[in-house]
Design a protein with these regions (language model features):
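Glycine-rich FAD pyrophosphate-binding loop
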Residues: 81-101
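Active-site/ligand-binding neighborhood in enzyme catalytic cores
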Residues: 192-299, 305-307
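Mid-domain catalytic core of redox enzymes
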Residues: 292-407, 411, 440
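N-terminal export signals
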Residues: 5-26
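Conserved flavin/dinucleotide-binding core of flavoenzymes
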Residues: 27-53, 57, 152, 373-377, ...
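Mobile amphipathic helical/loop "lid" adjacent to a hydrophobic cofactor/ligand pocket
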Residues: 34, 133-244
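Conserved FAD-binding subdomain of flavin-dependent enzymes
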Residues: 106-136
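N-terminal Rossmann-like FAD-binding beta1-loop-alpha1 element of flavoenzymes
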Residues: 63-86
């Protein structure tokens, strides 16, 4: 590609449409009109703003209705094989944040990226769907300006372009968070499971850490700006929060476990392979068990407490299903507007939930640009890292003339959330990303054919200070015959456990006493 042509197309939203744009080094592009498709939010925004929908009487009966078709909902549905149920998903695709896209035979990760190679989740996937992950392997790399520091942790930070004093501060940081996370982990698991305290002193330490931001914790422990900078790059996509907005406890717990990817696996396109297998499995259990394009706007227990009425919008028509039990598998901040029966204290807790918008910018090249590391973190860019999309199939291979897609984590700061609605701003972020990659790999922009941003915002829970004490006790607190799955927090493995537990709770409500 000639430099004057820059990028032929930027594909954004969930529609595959081409945007002609000017070269990175040119003037700002003219406003661009597109027919992009956003995540379905308008009906929920209407609820938030006080709009009163006219609720129709029930015209359909099911034993169970599941709100959403993300990982938790799909696990719940799969574990209710003999139950007459339906999953109502507002998007046209299932899988929640675990989705992928395909370009010229290469899958791109659009959300959830990897998981442990050995776990009960993987045992389940192998047993039920003959689905096993491929090893990722290797270590994190880190780009500072134009210097690529490979094997950051394995080489004990020796490659950093800093003084020995600063390198020693990185080592102190890793030693401290590793020690703290190891000490707190057992009690944290008990806390996350909703069980009674085993070690009161450790529980107190957890709550104290949870009450302050990670930025504050870094400052109190006198870490230099170079360590803070690393955390500001690493935390948004990995912890789903910037340090200034995040619970110190959550950041320490997650960062304390980062070392290498030698026991971590994935599939081409990330964990979407598991979500797709689950959706197919649920569909095979019975016709009509997943209904996409169905935005739930009201979930209410009947006055006699024997049923739940679930009202949803599909094709601009409101419909109500009556069921014996409903599993809430959607975002909890939506639940407070949709479930009028929600107790005031639970509603108040859910009002404190914040989300971080994370998307993937996929840079599509007609040759291989970089294939030495799975995740390479970088500074001075809208994105936080880049990953070869087909790494698990071709990791480390030398193949210069082979087309390559670099999938980039893009966590958008909360203060810039409104900018996600601006086409020209999205294009600008894509251009800045391509320009930064070209600084690191000179001439790479000449081989860039296309940039894809499938969804502008996957909403991930921002574990803000106080989340563990003020919010978490309520996320799985059921409301009558409405089972709250607690789907908002945790990994794909956590989604499995939450889905199975929700299925059991719904089954209990099907028993006629």
């Amino acid at each position: 590609m000639k430099r004057r042509d820059f990028i032929r197309t930027v594909i954004a939203g969930s529609a595959a449409l081409g945007w002609p744009v000017q070269r990175t080094y040119s003037e700002e592009p003219e406003p661009i009109q597109t027919n992009r498709q956003h995540v379905v939010r308008e009906p929920l925004h209407m609820l938030r703003d006080g709009y009163q929908f006219s609720i129709p009487e029930p015209t359909e009966f099911r034993e169970v209705v599941i709100v959403g078709a993300g990982a938790t909902s799909l696990f719940a549905a799969y574990h209710l094989p003999g139950v007459d149920l339906v999953c109502l998903e507002k998007e046209l695709r299932t899988g929640g944040n675990a989705q992928r896209d395909l370009r010229d035979g290469t899958y791109m990760n659009l959300g959830a990226a990897y998981t442990d190679m050995e776990s009960e989740l993987i045992d389940f996937m192998e047993r039920e769907f003959n689905l096993s992950p491929l090893l990722i392997g290797g270590y994190d790399a880190y780009v500072l300006d134009k210097t690529i520091v490979r094997n950051l942790y394995r080489d004990d930070f020796k490659g950093l372009p800093y003084s020995e004093r600063i390198k020693e501060e990185f080592r102190r940081f890793v030693a401290l968070i590793t020690e703290i996370s190891a000490r707190l982990r057992d009690e944290a698991d008990i806390l996350f499971a909703g069980k009674a305290t085993v070690d009161p002193l450790v529980r107190r330490e957890i709550l104290d850490l949870d009450s302050i931001s990670f930025e504050h914790w870094l400052r109190v422990n006198n870490f230099p700006k170079e360590v803070v900078k690393w955390c500001e790059i690493y935390c948004p996509p990995q912890v789903s929060s910037f340090p200034k907005n995040s619970s110190a406890f959550i950041c320490v717990l997650i960062m304390g476990g980062m070392q290498n990817y030698d026991s971590i696996g994935s599939w081409p396109g990330g964990l979407a392979a598991m979500a797709e297998a689950l959706a197919e499995g649920v569909t095979k259990q019975g016709q009509g068990r997943i209904r996409t394009g169905s935005c739930v706007i009201r979930v209410k227990n009947t006055i006699d407490g024997k049923f739940v009425d679930v009202t949803y919008l599909q094709d601009n028509k409101l419909q109500t299903i009556r069921c014996r039990a409903c599993i809430w598998g959607a975002h909890n901040h939506v639940a407070r507007y949709v479930i009028p029966d929600m107790p005031a204290e639970q509603n108040d807790a859910f009002s404190k939930i914040e989300y971080l918008d994370i998307s993937m910018i996929n840079l599509c090249f007609n040759r291989t640009i970089y294939n030495k590391d799975y995740i390479t973190w970088l500074d001075n860019a809208p994105i936080q890292n880049f990953m070869p999309a087909d790494w698990v199939l071709n990791r480390g291979k030398t193949r210069e003339d082979t087309p390559q897609i670099l999938s980039c984590d893009w966590a958008n700061p909360p203060e810039k959330r409104s900018m996600l609605l601006s086409d020209s701003w999205i294009v600008e972020q894509c251009q800045l990303t391509a320009s930064r990659i070209n600084e690191i790999f000179p001439g790479s922009i000449d081989y860039l054919e296309e940039i894809r941003v499938f969804l502008r915002a996957h909403s991930w829970v921002n574990y803000s200070p106080g989340y563990v004490s003020d919010v978490m006790p309520y996320v799985s607190k059921d409301i009558g015959r409405i089972v709250m799955s607690g789907t908002d927090h945790g990994s794909f493995s956590d989604s499995m456990y939450a889905g199975i537990e929700s299925a059991a709770a719904a089954s209990d409500r099907l028993v006629v006493h």
